[in-house]
Regions:
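A short beta-strand-loop micro-motif that forms or neighbors metal/cofactor-
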Residues: 104-116
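Conserved short internal alpha-helix adjacent to the catalytic or cofactor-binding core
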Residues: 43-46, 54, 58-88
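Helicase P-loop NTPase motor core
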Residues: 1-47, 70-74, 106, 128, ...
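Accessory C-terminal helicase-associated subdomains
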Residues: 18-20, 75, 88, 117-200
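Conserved helicase motor
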Residues: 28-31, 51-59, 185
């Protein structure tokens, strides 16, 4: 594997005293390729800094999809739920979200549990109807957790939300790079599943 070779070579050069870590640079063609290097550098204790880009797991599309997985697994993470409630756009405004958050705080329940009770929040009115499809989607995905793999679940999230279709419709270089990042995330999940006896 290329990333492993590069990590070993950098460590050997630093150990021999020929170079310092700061003397080394890795160039790659697409941002999606950075993940492999980042992971090898972390495992190999090689300090690194990404120049002209963003850490793989800090990219919007990756954070969005991981927030979906986190919400499906455990909807008690209010930040994850709030991150994805309008991804893709569902027309749920800030006022509605604040009213749900107020209800959750008053009832001492999670934001997601408050979303599930949208019909019972008097201040929401017709806005409650916009919340239902999101809650239904998460509940359907939660029901599949025990019967499909994480990679299949991730693919279903992408398909059902239309995440990649929206990016394809943008037809920009940035959108293409984001699709490559999503493909790289799927590859990472598949590799994890293949390497683990009981992947979760």
């Amino acid at each position: 594997e290329e990333a492993e070779y590069v990590a070993k070579d950098i460590n050997a050069c630093v150990k021999d005293g020929r170079y310092h870590y700061g003397d080394c640079a890795v160039l790659y063609r697409t941002n999606a390729q950075s993940r492999l290097f980042e992971e090898k550098f972390i495992v190999s204790n090689i300090p690194y800094k990404i120049v002209g880009g963003v850490n793989f797991y800090a990219r919007k599309e990756i954070k969005d999809l991981l927030a979906y997985l986190k919400t499906i697994d455990n909807a008690r993470d209010d930040l994850a739920v709030r991150r994805i409630i309008n991804v893709p756009k569902r027309g749920i405004g800030a006022t509605t979200l604040n009213r749900v958050a107020d209800y959750a705080a008053t009832a001492d329940i999670s934001f997601y549990n408050a979303l599930k009770m949208a019909d019972d929040i008097p201040t929401l009115g017709k806005s409650a109807a916009k919340i239902k499809p999101f809650v239904n989607f998460i509940q359907v995905m939660r029901s599949k957790v025990e019967i499909i793999s994480v990679s299949e679940l991730l693919q279903e999230i992408i398909d059902e939300t239309g995440y990649v279709k929206e990016l394809e419709a943008e037809d920009t270089e940035e959108a293409k790079a984001r699709i490559e990042n999503i493909d790289e995330l799927i590859s990472k999940v598949v590799a994890y599943e293949e390497g683990e006896e009981h992947p979760t």
